[in-house]
UniProtKB/Swiss-Prot annotation:
It comes from Methanothermobacter thermautotrophicus (strain ATCC 29096 / DSM 1053 / JCM 10044 / NBRC 100330 / Delta H) (Methanobacterium thermoautotrophicum). One of its GO terms (cellular component) is cytoplasm. One of its GO terms (molecular function) is hydroxymethylbilane synthase activity. This is Probable porphobilinogen deaminase. It catalyses: 4 porphobilinogen + H2O = hydroxymethylbilane + 4 NH4(+). Gene3D superfamilies: Periplasmic binding protein-like II, Porphobilinogen deaminase, C-terminal domain. NCBIfam families: hemC (TIGR00212). The keyword Transferase applies. Binds 1 dipyrromethane group covalently. One of its GO terms (biological process) is protoporphyrinogen IX biosynthetic process. SUPFAM superfamilies: Periplasmic binding protein-like II, Porphobilinogen deaminase (hydroxymethylbilane synthase), C-terminal domain. It comes from the Archaea. Tetrapolymerization of the monopyrrole PBG into the hydroxymethylbilane pre-uroporphyrinogen in several discrete steps. Its EC number is 2.5.1.61.
């Protein structure tokens, strides 16, 4: 069995984690194949200034469809909401923290007005503006190590990152502040992984054994909301699903780039009805997109 992956340190750690889990449920030996994506090649553009759908996944998905690899491991937030019908999300392992964190030498309240905040995320820019942080936004792309180095070297004063990536790489010492998800709401699927296969693959049932169903239902609701709204990186939308027992709560926030609150919704329902919960939240937000 061959697993396709991007070549970054984080992608390899994530793929190795999935391979370890699969090795406990599959007898086949699994090898990695590194595939470079368009997002890996383009480093000088803001994500929201281009069509970002499949930016970090398309080449891997094509390798799956062309049977060059048997599966691909993605950060679920990068997976398009309208996945190719010939592909399937075969597994969603247990989700890591979906939270956003501050990486900086100074804490959130101590960053002065005019501080340079590095980000290429319209959502993160909007949430900073919403909290009346008069930062100077600086484009910041690159892998996790590169972004941390630019903060530590003083090229920017701070950046906002996904806690999951830092934890997976053992870089928690760089976290200055962990934000509550209601204060700085993450991207859909943040912290989760997706194992992609062909929709007709015989491997789906065995790979699916590593799925963590509460995590799957959380991200299903989040991604359904995005799909129904047709929202992507060009839309400053934060959304988080939280499973508690057999119940699911979906919380979503839509801002303008300047940080004005357009709509905030909370929808609750049975965990098994995650897609319907996402659709209901989208219905409550559709007039504001």
């Amino acid at each position: 069995m061959i697993a396709g992956t991007r070549g970054s340190r984080l992608a390899l750690v994530q793929t190795n984690h999935v391979i370890e889990m699969l090795s406990e449920v599959c007898k086949e030996k699994i090898e990695k194949k590194i595939i470079k994506t368009k997002g890996d090649r383009i480093r000088d553009s803001q994500l929201y200034s281009m069509d970002s759908r499949g930016l970090f996944t398309r080449e891997l998905d094509m390798a799956v469809l062309n049977e060059e690899v048997d599966l691909a491991v993605h950060s679920l937030k990068d997976v398009p909401s309208d996945l190719d019908p010939d592909l399937a999300i075969a597994a969603v392992p247990p989700r890591e923290s979906p939270a956003e964190v501050l990486v900086s030498r100074l804490d959130w309240e101590d960053l002065p007005q005019g501080s340079k905040l590095g980000t290429s995320s319209l959502r993160r820019e909007a949430f900073c503006n919403h909290h009346q942080k008069n930062f100077k936004m600086e484009p910041l792309r690159g892998n996790i190590d590169t972004r941390i180095r630019k903060v530590m070297d003083g090229e920017v004063h701070a950046t906002i990152m996904a806690e999951a990536g830092l934890k997976r790489l053992g870089l928690e010492e760089h976290i200055k502040r962990r934000f509550p998800v209601e204060y700085f709401t993450p991207a859909a699927g943040q912290g989760a992984l997706a194992v992609i296969t062909r929709a007709d693959s015989e491997l789906i049932s065995s790979i699916g054994r590593i799925t963590h169903h509460p995590s799957l239902q959380e991200v299903t609701a989040e991604k359904t909301l995005l799909r129904e709204l047709g929202a992507g990186c060009q839309c400053p939308l934060g959304v988080i699903g939280r499973a508690t027992g057999n119940q699911l709560t979906l919380y979503a926030v839509l801002l303008t780039r300047e940080g004005e609150m357009l709509r905030k919704v909370t929808v609750r329902g049975p965990l098994a009805e995650a897609e319907d919960i996402g659709k209901k939240a989208a219905k409550e937000m559709e007039d504001y997109i």
